[in-house]
C-alpha cells in the first residue's frame, strides 16, 4: 500500500517531503502510517482517564473501538481529543470520519489508530456499506475461542453479581459476573472487568435479554468464557427500581463477614439467593413467609441493604415448604439449583487442589444416595468444611446446591455460599 502511494506520487510530481494523506480499510492498517483518514462505525468507548507524564504533568486518554466491513481497530484519543465536544454522545453504530490520524503498534504488536493535536473525528450521515450494530450482533451459541470485539446477544441464566479483587499490580479492581445462554440453551460464563452494579438496572428478571457490545471470547476452566472491560457496553432488559418479593425462607446461612445468606422460594417454586447486609431479617426464622423490598434483584440474586425493608407475613400455604421443593437425585440436571435429602454412602474426603494460578484450595467430596440414585456432593474452600461434619450412614438435608457436569459426563452437586446441611437422624 505504501509503495504504491510512492509510485503514484512520483507519477504526478508530488514531493514526498510532506506526509502523504492515506485512506484505507482497518484490515490494511500498519504501524507508521500518517495522515490517515478513514470512515468507520463506533463499536464502544471507554471513559476519559487522567494519567501523569514522567515530568508530572497530567494528560488525558480515551480508548475507542471502531469497525468496518472487514475488521476492527483500537483508537486512542489523546489530551484535548479525549474530551472533544459531543464525544460522550457517540453511540455504538454511529458512522464517523477519522481525519489525519497516525498509526502505532500497541504492546501486543497490533496497529492502533492515534488521534492527537493534528487529528480529528467527525460524525457523518453518509450512506455506508459498513453494517449496523444490529447486523453484526451474534447469538452466543455461535461463539468461538479467540474471537474479539464482538457484539453478542443472550439471556440471563442464574445469578448476576459483582466482585472486588486485587490485580497483579496490587491495585483494587471490580468486575461484574453473570451467566448467559443462547438459542441452544447452553450457558456461558461472562466476566466484565472494571464494571459494577451501577452500570446495570436494579431489577433484572431471570430470563432477561442481554446485549454486550465489545467483548472477547476466551477458553476458561469450564469452556468458553466471554470477557469484557470498562469499555464494554451493557444493554439489559430491566427496571430502575426493584419490585417486592414474597417468599418462604428455606434456610439461613451466615457468611464470614456476618451477612445472612438466605435461600427463599416463591409460589412459582423459583429459588432466590437473598443476601442481607442490613440485618433486616434478624426477626425471621426458617419456614417464615416474608415480603421484602430489595435494593437490587439480579436474576435470582437478591440484595437487602439499609434502603430495603422486610416484614413477616401470615403463613401462605400456596408457597411451598422445603419438603415440597426437594428434588430426587435422578431428576437433577446440569446448571440447576437444588435441595435434596439423602443418606451418606461415603464419608467426606478432603484434599488440596492447585489452580492454574498456583493457588492451593480446599476440596471436600462425599457420595450420597436417595431412593432414585446416587451422586457426588462437593464443596470448595469454606463450603468444604461443611461436608467434614457429615458421617457415614447419616440422613442429611442439603439446600442451595448447584449441579455441574463432571468427569465422564456424570452430574455432580456443589455446595454454594447459600447451602446448609441439616442432619435428620
List PLM regions with ranges.
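Single-stranded nucleic acid-binding proteins centered on OB/S1-type folds
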Residues: 1-425
Amino acid at each position: 500500500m505504501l509503495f504504491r502511494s510512492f509510485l503514484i506520487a512520483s507519477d504526478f510530481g508530488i514531493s514526498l517531503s510532506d506526509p502523504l494523506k492515506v485512506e484505507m480499510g482497518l484490515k490494511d492498517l500498519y504501524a507508521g502510517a500518517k495522515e490517515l483518514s478513514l470512515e468507520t462505525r463506533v463499536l464502544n468507548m471507554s471513559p476519559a482517564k487522567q494519567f501523569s507524564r514522567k515530568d508530572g504533568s497530567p494528560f488525558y486518554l480515551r480508548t475507542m473501538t471502531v469497525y468496518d466491513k472487514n475488521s476492527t481497530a483500537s483508537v486512542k484519543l489523546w489530551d484535548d481529543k479525549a474530551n472533544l465536544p459531543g464525544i460522550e454522545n457517540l453511540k455504538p453504530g454511529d458512522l464517523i470520519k477519522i481525519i489525519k490520524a497516525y498509526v502505532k503498534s500497541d504492546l501486543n504488536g497490533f496497529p492502533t489508530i492515534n488521534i492527537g493535536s493534528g487529528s480529528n473525528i467527525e460524525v457523518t450521515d453518509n450512506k455506508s456499506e459498513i453494517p449496523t450494530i444490529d447486523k453484526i450482533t451474534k447469538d452466543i451459541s455461535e461463539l468461538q475461542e479467540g474471537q474479539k470485539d464482538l457484539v453478542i446477544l443472550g439471556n440471563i441464566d442464574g445469578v448476576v453479581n459483582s466482585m472486588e479483587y486485587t490485580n497483579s499490580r496490587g491495585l483494587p479492581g471490580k468486575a461484574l459476573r453473570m451467566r448467559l445462554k443462547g438459542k441452544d440453551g447452553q450457558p456461558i460464563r461472562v466476566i466484565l472487568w472494571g464494571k459494577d452494579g451501577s452500570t446495570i438496572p436494579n431489577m433484572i428478571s431471570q430470563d432477561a435479554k442481554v446485549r454486550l457490545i465489545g467483548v472477547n471470547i476466551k477458553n476458561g476452566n469450564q469452556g468458553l468464557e466471554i470477557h469484557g472491560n470498562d469499555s464494554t457496553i451493557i444493554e439489559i432488559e430491566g427496571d430502575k427500581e426493584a419490585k417486592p418479593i414474597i417468599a418462604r425462607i428455606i434456610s439461613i446461612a451466615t457468611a464470614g463477614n456476618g451477612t445472612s445468606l438466605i435461600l427463599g422460594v416463591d409460589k412459582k417454586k423459583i429459588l432466590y439467593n437473598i443476601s442481607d447486609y442490613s440485618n433486616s431479617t434478624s426477626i425471621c426464622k426458617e419456614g417464615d413467609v416474608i415480603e421484602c423490598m430489595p435494593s437490587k434483584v439480579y436474576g435470582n440474586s437478591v440484595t437487602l441493604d439499609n434502603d430495603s425493608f422486610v416484614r413477616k407475613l401470615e403463613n401462605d400455604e400456596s408457597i411451598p415448604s422445603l419438603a415440597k421443593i426437594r428434588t430426587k437425585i435422578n431428576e437433577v440436571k446440569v446448571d440447576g439449583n437444588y435441595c435434596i435429602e439423602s443418606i451418606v454412602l461415603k464419608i467426606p474426603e478432603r484434599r488440596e487442589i492447585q489452580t492454574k494460578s498456583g493457588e492451593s484450595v480446599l476440596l471436600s467430596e462425599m457420595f450420597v444416595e436417595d431412593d432414585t440414585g446416587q451422586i457426588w456432593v462437593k464443596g470448595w474452600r469454606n463450603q468444604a468444611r461443611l461436608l467434614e461434619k457429615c458421617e457415614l450412614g447419616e440422613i442429611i438435608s442439603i439446600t442451595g446446591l448447584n449441579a455441574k457436569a463432571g468427569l465422564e459426563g456424570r452430574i455432580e452437586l456443589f455446595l454454594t455460599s447459600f447451602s446448609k446441611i441439616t442432619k435428620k437422624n
